[in-house]
Amino acid sequence: MSLNRRQFIQASGLALCAGMTPLAAKASGNPAALPIPPLLESRRGQPLFLTMQRAHWAFSGDRKTSIWGINGRYLGPTVRVYDGDDVKLIYSNRLNEPVAMTIGGLQVPGPLMGGAARIISPGGDWSPVLPIRQSSATCWYHANTPNRMAPHIYNGLVGLWLVEDSTSKSLPLPNHYGVDDFPLIIQDKRLDNFGVPLYNPPSSGGFVGDSLLVNGVQSPFVEVSRGWVRLRLLNASNSRRYVMRLSDGRAMNVIASDQGLLPAPMAVNQLSLAPGERREILIDMSQGEEVTLTAGESAGIMDRLRGLFEPSSILISTQILTLKPTGLLPLVTDNLPMRLLADNIIEGSISRTREFRLGDSLPGINGAMWDMTRADVQTQLGRCERWIIHADTPQAFHIQGVKFLVRSANGRPPAVEDSGWKDTVWIDNDVELLVYFMQPSSMAFPFLYYSQTLELADRGSTGQLIVQSAM
């Protein structure tokens, strides 16, 4: 809808009085220091506590609003565990409605995955013991409540879950949390003039906002030492995909995807991050020049004026994070390692091929809505299958309990940053995946595969995966 003459005059007057932009836009001109979520580490014999509860947070300036949080703050603490650990995790629900939680990317059996079979009632707890038996990876824990995943994630039930192993600890990569190794949880929201998040699910497609938030604030900065800086990126938006660049055009070095390290660092000038995807990048700050990680073009003045009268899907600011180097260059700096892991090889033959069609116009997956009493896919532990997935509307897609390689996208080789093991992929028409089934599940505790456009998943674009142990 375009602005009529009266609206334009009104908007012009409001903008002049308010400094030419609404509150959400003004906040982008006053960058805040990047909030660093607290770090929770697994200790032998000590449980980890994650409590879902109401809290207060300021998305714009100092004006705090009531939100959902974990352990008393918006977004949860970063959890760090180690390959070989057995982690007792205690989820506590102190909200006034049922919540289900899961850990995206964690390789555990179906009974420990969470979700619909492990709904936590108000005042209730769930205390799984999680065997950590996988390579290093940046995972994430989040709400997975049936038909309520979109609003629960939007409200703030999200956090990072880091797995480390002997390889990741031995490599010369930045690993000092909050010093040269930073978690970035990226979301888009719509804020009113008091900084309160608004959520109105659309009748079709997924929700998009006009305010870009990183760790819960707009346009943050962080001071870093000169040298390599590691950013662990999570797109926790409901449906928006980001294409990221550095403001001065320098390259980013991608070192990891959803399921862990790539075989070798990949230098790229732009990087896609779909909902639910995680990537790790290294940025060389040794030259001592400030740089900003951005996500596309921001709204112009007419788009901002229009946003006073109608919801906008154009981001007011596209600044993700500004890196400000400080201090002197160390006498000795580590070179970027040429190799990180051995090449990805799938052992064994492809047991079968399956096709799936996602769509907004065609409800569900292959025309079927999610049914918790139906097994949509049954396979065996250790098998590899070819999955060909079509999407009428561009969207991300996630599979629990597996890892996969992207064999092709629209008939072409995948982007270089998609060369590693993954569990989430962006689909714009067609992708071909080689899916390796890592963990067992059952009808009582199935894995899910679903659209990562969360509103579509809540409407039924979800299927159930049963992985039977080999006889």
UniProtKB/Swiss-Prot annotation:
Subcellular location: Periplasm
Protein name: Cell division protein FtsP
GO biological process: FtsZ-dependent cytokinesis
Main location: periplasm
Pfam family, one: Cu-oxidase_2
GO CC annotation terms, alphabetical: cell division site; outer membrane-bounded periplasmic space
Keywords: Cell cycle, Cell division, Periplasm, Signal
Family designation: Belongs to the FtsP family.
Signal peptide range: 1-27
Domain Plastocyanin-like: 229-287
InterPro entries, A to Z: Cu-oxidase-like_N (IPR011707), Cu-oxidase_C (IPR011706), Cu-oxidase_fam (IPR045087), Cupredoxin (IPR008972), FtsP (IPR026589), TAT_signal (IPR006311)
PROSITE patterns found in the cross-reference section: TAT
Stated role: Cell division protein that is required for growth during stress conditions. May be involved in protecting or stabilizing the divisomal assembly under conditions of stress.
Post-translational modification: Predicted to be exported by the Tat system. The position of the signal peptide cleavage has not been experimentally proven.
Gene3D superfamilies: Cupredoxins - blue copper proteins (2.60.40.420)
Classification via NCBIfam families: PRK10883.1 (NF008135)
GO molecular function, one term: oxidoreductase activity
